[in-house]
Structures are given as C-alpha cells and as structure tokens.
Design a protein with these regions (language model features):
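Active-site nucleophile-adjacent alpha helix/oxyanion-hole segment immediately C-terminal to the catalytic cysteine
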Residues: 81, 95-96, 101-113, 117-324, ...
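Intrinsic-disorder/low-complexity loop/linker signature
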Residues: 14, 26, 96, 254, ...
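A generic structural signal for solvent-exposed, polar alpha-helical segments
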Residues: 10, 222-225, 254, 357, ...
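Active-site signature of cysteine proteases
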Residues: 19-51, 59-60, 68, 73, ...
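Low-complexity, intrinsically disordered export/secretion signals at extreme N-termini
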Residues: 4-101, 105-109, 121, 126
Length: 476
C-alpha cells in the first residue's frame, strides 16, 4: 500500500517550493500493486527538480464550455427570481453582495445543471430562508456556499481542533457503546485529528463546486437541512454495462437506493452521524485554513459513499470491506464515489506499473499518450482528479497525494504546464506543474471512458470490485 502524505512548503524568492515530503502523515492510501506488463526506464523520475509556482488569478479550466447544452442566463426573468435574489442580498455584507452580483453577471447564479434542475439561486434562497440542521447557522452556511462556488480554491481538508468546552461531549460520542478501558482511552485520543485523510473527498467537493455549481449548491442546501441528506438520480449504465452489475455495486457500497426501472436509480447520500459534531464546532470555532461546516458535511458524505458507510468524522477513520487501512479511500472506492456523485461513466486509468514490492518499474503507456488523455479531458470541460506518487532512491513508492488538474497552458515550444488544485497545502490558489515533473508521477487519473478506451485496455470499475471482493472473501 502507498501511504499518502502532505507536503511542507516554504517560500524562496517569492516562489513556493516543495522542501520535503512529510513522512509522518498518513493522509491517503490506494492499492498500487499490479502485475508488471512492460519495463520502462524510470531512473529520471527521482531526479526531477520540484519547482511548482502559483498562478496570480483563477485559471481558465478548458477551451470548451463546461455546460454546453445549457443557455447561459444573466438576467432575473421572474418576480420569484427577483425576490430570491433580493432576499439573499439582504443577508450578506457589501463584499458578499458584490460576489453574488458577479455570479449573476457570469451566468453562474442562474445555472440549472443540477440533478433536479434547480438553480444556484434557488438553493441559496432555501439556505437563507429555511431551517438548517440543529447547531448550524443559515448565514454561515449561505456565506460559505457562495464563497466555495465563487472561488473553490478555498476548499480545504484541514480538520479543526476541538475546543475544551466540546471535548467531553465529543469523546463521549466517540466512545458510545464501548466497554473496554483500552478502547475507551484510544477513543479519547483518536478525536484529536492532526492530519486529514479526506483528500479524495475534498477533491471531489472542489470538482463539484467548480464544474457543477448548481449541483454543489443543491448538495449544500440538502446536506445542511434538518434531514441531513441529499437524493440523486443516476443512470445505472454510468456504473456498469449491465443493470445487475450496477445494482451489485450499489449494494456492495451499502448505498440506500430505489429503482423504478432498469435504467435509473435514486440514491441517498448522507454524512456520518458524527459529522454534525464537527460541523457545529466549525460554525462557532473555525480558525484560518480550517474546514468550514460545509466542508465537514460534504467531505463526510463523500467519505461515507466510498467507505461503504463506515466513516467516522470524529476520528477521520473508516472500516469497510474493500480497504484494510483505516484512513482514506483506495482507488476503486474513489472511482465509485466520483461516478455516482457526477453521474458519469468514470474510469480510473492506472498509468504506473508497480511490482509486488511497490516498486515503480514502468508505465502502461507512453507519457505522450497520458498527456493527450489529460488535455483532451480538460478541453471537454472536465476537471481531472489524479493520484500521484513519490518514490525513494530505489523507485519504491513511499508517498503520494490526490489533487485535481483544472487546466493547462502550452508554451511556444509545445511544452505543457498543468494547472492544479491541492486541498491540503493551506494555499487557496492554483499551483502549476510542468509536464516533465507531473506526468511521470501520475499513478492514476479519473477520466471519461471514451477518452481512453481506444488506447488502453481498462478494467471497468464494477469488474474490479467483484474480483476484489471475491479475493477478499476467499482469503477470509
């Protein structure tokens, strides 16, 4: 297993540089053990210089519109919309009103590319006027939702500390039904989370806010409401080629769902029962660079989806049938989560060839093809979540991380620079990596099926899941 870690950054001559990998942090894990197909010289991987820089403004994510089928609206057409708009503005300060006005002028506020065709405006209005879950504040949730949609780079995975006045209640909640003294002591220690394992969930949250703002607003509204859950109707063919295999996946991940036909299913997503404790604390005690209450609810929900409903927000740990590690999500779980959240046929494309000792020995395709896959997806309006690795001097994978590629630019020599977002760097801006640095480090990328199926023989997510489950059952 690869142990994922965050990076320590420092400022040198005004440019943010990577100093070292923090080996103390168990941040995220995925299964990198695959059969060796071909040997490729990878000696240059470990010798690359690490020189990421930061963009000064929000990058253009693609050359193609993200929602080409929707007509962009920038004018409030009805009395209802005007009333919703006025009501929202009345609950914001001057800066907040300016941001909402800009969302209207850019077509984001009236975007309706959500599962129920509600607009960003509709859902912000509900947040502002309808009750929130106990302990949550409407104005805080409204402000945080607007901010995340307007500038998703502020989304972070950094846990907040538990203030003394909450400590006893949180420990009691975490130790519920425990009788063993050692377990009780450990439970009291586990609630003090120093390093987050939610990079997949935070990257999913970022992508949802950036790529589907209306759906993000709908999730924010529903998850912070008294019911603390959101329904989503998906196409079963986006999970598997056959309906029964899609149903198997939903059951395997323990997702509550209803089916009325062989084509679609209505799923129910919810944060874990302890997420509300974290969300309440962040409502009143949020420090700079920590998660907002909205981040808590979103990331808990996505962790629940991927971990077979086994996540605990108090400890940032999970159980579940597919992962023996108690932190983060493995690649298969990540792909399932992204597929149901975005209702798309997402494939996790593994690019690195790794032997049974977690040694990077080659690639499944050449780096040029990898670059083509990424730039094609970006040109189609996709934000691409990738897992990249760090190796030691013997090319043994020791660390890695999950980030999102949001765009790219090409210089006059044809060299590509990828524009990325990292939810764990405490820097609310995009970061840039050259293709020479990033491409050799990419272990996997979540890409639409049609982009890669002609170049690589990809095992579908449901097939991988069934095989993995059979292997684990056989070993039990």
């Amino acid at each position: 297993m690869a142990i994922f870690s965050d990076f320590n950054f420092y400022n040198r001559c005004g440019v943010i540089m990577v100093e070292q990998v923090n080996f103390r942090t168990r941040q995220y894990n995925y299964n990198t053990i695959n059969s060796v197909k071909s040997a490729v010289n990878t000696s240059y991987v470990k010798n690359l210089s690490v020189t990421p820089t930061f963009t000064a403004s929000v990058p253009i994510t693609s050359k193609a519109p993200q929602v080409a089928s929707l007509k962009m609206r920038t004018t409030l057409d009805s009395k209802e919309e005007k009333n919703e708009y006025t009501t929202i503005l009345s609950q914001l300060d001057k800066n907040g009103r300016k941001i909402v006005d800009n969302l209207l002028k850019t077509g984001v506020l009236l975007n309706s590319d959500s599962n129920d065709h509600s607009t960003v405006l509709d859902n912000l209005y509900k947040i502002a006027t309808e009750p929130r879950a106990e302990g949550l504040d409407s104005k805080t949730m409204l402000k945080d939702t607007i901010a995340a949609i307007a500038y998703p780079y502020i989304i972070t995975q950094q846990f907040g500390d538990i203030p003394p006045e909450y400590q006893q209640r949180v420990v009691a909640a975490n130790n519920e039904n425990k009788t063993n003294l050692i377990d009780i002591w450990q439970g009291s220690q586990d609630v003090n989370v120093e390093h987050s394992g939610t990079c997949v969930a935070a990257s999913t949250e970022f992508k949802l806010a950036k790529q589907l703002p209306a759906e993000f607003a709908r999730f924010a509204q529903e998850l912070s409401s008294p019911k603390l859950s959101v329904n989503k109707t998906i196409g079963l063919n986006n999970l598997a080629d056959e309906t029964l295999n899609a149903i198997w996946l939903l059951n395997a991940f323990e997702i509550p769902f209803e089916t009325n036909n062989f084509n679609t299913a209505k799923l129910n997503f919810a944060p874990d029962k302890n997420a509300i404790f974290r969300a309440k604390i962040q409502t009143t005690n949020k420090d700079p660079y920590e998660r907002t209450p909205l981040d808590v609810l979103m990331q808990s929900t996505f962790m629940q989806i991927g971990s077979q409903q086994s996540y605990n927000s108090l400890t940032d740990k999970r159980a579940g049938k597919f992962n023996q590690n108690d932190k983060g999500l493995i690649e298969f779980e990540k792909t399932f989560t992204e597929s149901v959240v975005f209702d798309k046929n997402i494939l996790s494309v593994t690019y690195q060839t790794v032997d049974e000792n977690a040694r990077l020995v080659g690639y499944e395709t050449d780096l040029g093809t990898m670059k083509k896959h990424l730039t094609t997806a970006l040109d189609e309006g996709e934000n691409v979540i990738i897992g990249y690795t760090q190796t030691d001097n013997n090319n043994i994978i020791v660390n890695g991380h999950e980030i999102t590629i949001v765009g790219y630019k090409t210089d006059d020599k044809g060299k590509v620079t990828f524009i990325c977002n990292d939810t764990d760097d405490n820097i609310p801006r995009a970061i840039e990596y050259s293709e020479d640095y990033l491409l050799p480090k990419i272990h996997h990328a979540a890409l639409p099926k049609h982009i890669v199926e002609g170049d690589l023989n990809i095992v579908p997510n449901w097939t991988e899941g069934i095989d993995m489950y059979k292997q684990m059952k056989g070993a039990a």
